[in-house]
């Protein structure tokens, strides 16, 4: 019976098995995992990749021993007998998967079997992660808009109060040789002073506040240069306005 089983095993070994998929390291070329078409897995095959075969025989795992076998005392932590250990580095401290310390819980008489590790997952490690600011919800957006309107209204009220005080004191009309100027010349002077930023209280764009909604982002504060589908992040916030989405008036500001 043993001879027939050996012959069958030799015949099965002679037939090349088709590999379903294989995972290898792009840095060293070492084969990490190999699964054949029949579903069997082969970790670090010795026949094809002898340099990547680390152990000739693995120790009994999960505390399973034969009838006459006795577990041998281990001089080191049983966690190191696992086939695969995920080590994470965080500010100089090395921890295992599950936030367990590596050697802090080591004891000389610790002979517990190693924990069961989940081998049914493929984990991809990358260092090309970027954090993108989450968009505001509707309530936050409306709250910010109301805050902007309150700021603009307060500024306009302050400027209007100052102008009312000046009018109460009596601002003389422009005159020439002791007589008031005609309406056409007064309109021309008004437009000229408006361009120079001397009379912002009569500006139709900002209504005398001196500040207006941003013409680029229209108060949303999102930059048009931030392309979220490519690696071309130049600015996440609009560079033309302040934190409230406002900018100086283009008509009456100097």
Swiss-Prot record:
Q: Name one GO cellular component term.
A: microvillus
Q: Kindly list any coiled-coil regions of this protein.
A: none
Q: Which InterPro entries match?
A: GRXCR2, HSP_DnaJ_Cys-rich_dom_sf
Biased composition range(s): Basic and acidic residues: 1-16
Give the keywords, sorted. Cell projection, Hearing
Q: Superkingdom, according to UniProt? A: Eukaryota
**GO terms under biological process:** auditory receptor cell stereocilium organization; inner ear receptor cell stereocilium organization; protein localization to organelle; sensory perception of sound
Subunit field text: Interacts with TPRN; the interaction restricts TPRN to the stereocilum basal region.
Q: What is this protein called?
A: Glutaredoxin domain-containing cysteine-rich protein 2
Similarity comment: Belongs to the GRXCR2 family.
Please report the organism this UniProt entry assigns to the protein.
Mus musculus
Where in the cell? Cell projection, Stereocilium
- Report which gene this protein is encoded by: Grxcr2
Null mutant phenotype: Mice appear normal at postnatal week 2, but develop progressive hearing loss associated with early defects in orientation and organization of cochlear stereocilia bundles. They have normal vestibular function. Reducing Tprn expression corrects stereocilium morphological defects and partially restores hearing in Grxcr2 mutant mice.
Instruction: Map out region (Disordered) in residue numbers.
Output: 1-20, 161-183
Q: In which tissues is it expressed?
A: Expressed in sensory hair cells in the cochlea and vestibular organ.
- Tell me if Membrane is a UniProt keyword of this record: no
Which Pfam family, any one of them, does this sequence belong to? GRXCR1-2_C
- Function recorded in the entry: Required for hearing. Plays a role in maintaining cochlear stereocilia bundles that are involved in sound detection. Ensures the restriction of TPRN to the basal region of stereocilia in hair cells.
Alphabetical list of PANTHER family matching this protein = GLUTAREDOXIN DOMAIN-CONTAINING CYSTEINE-RICH PROTEIN 2
């Amino acid at each position: 019976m043993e001879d027939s089983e050996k012959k069958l095993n030799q015949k099965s070994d002679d037939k090349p098995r088709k590999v379903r998929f294989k995972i290898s390291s792009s840095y060293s070329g070492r084969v990490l995992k190999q699964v054949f078409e029949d579903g069997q897995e082969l970790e670090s095959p010795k026949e094809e990749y002898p340099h990547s075969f680390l152990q000739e025989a693995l120790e009994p795992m999960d505390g399973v021993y034969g009838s006459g076998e006795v577990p041998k005392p281990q001089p080191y932590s049983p966690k190191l007998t696992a086939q695969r250990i995920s080590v994470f580095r965080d500010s100089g401290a090395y921890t295992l998967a599950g936030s367990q310390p590596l050697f802090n819980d080591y004891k000389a008489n610790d002979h517990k079997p190693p924990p069961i590790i989940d081998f049914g997952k493929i984990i991809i490690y990358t260092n090309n992660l970027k954090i993108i600011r989450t968009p505001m919800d509707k309530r936050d957006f409306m709250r910010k808009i109301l805050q902007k309107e309150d700021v603009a209204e307060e500024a306009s009220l302050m400027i209007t109060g100052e102008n009312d005080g000046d009018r109460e004191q009596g601002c003389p009309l422009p005159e020439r040789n002791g007589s008031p100027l005609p309406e056409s010349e007064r309109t021309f002077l008004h437009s000229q002073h408006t361009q120079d930023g001397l009379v912002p209280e009569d500006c139709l764009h900002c209504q005398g506040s001196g500040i207006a909604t941003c013409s680029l982002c229209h108060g949303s504060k999102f930059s048009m240069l931030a392309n979220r589908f490519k690696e071309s992040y130049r600015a996440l916030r609009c560079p033309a306005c302040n934190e409230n989405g406002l900018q100086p008036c283009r008509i009456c500001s100097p």
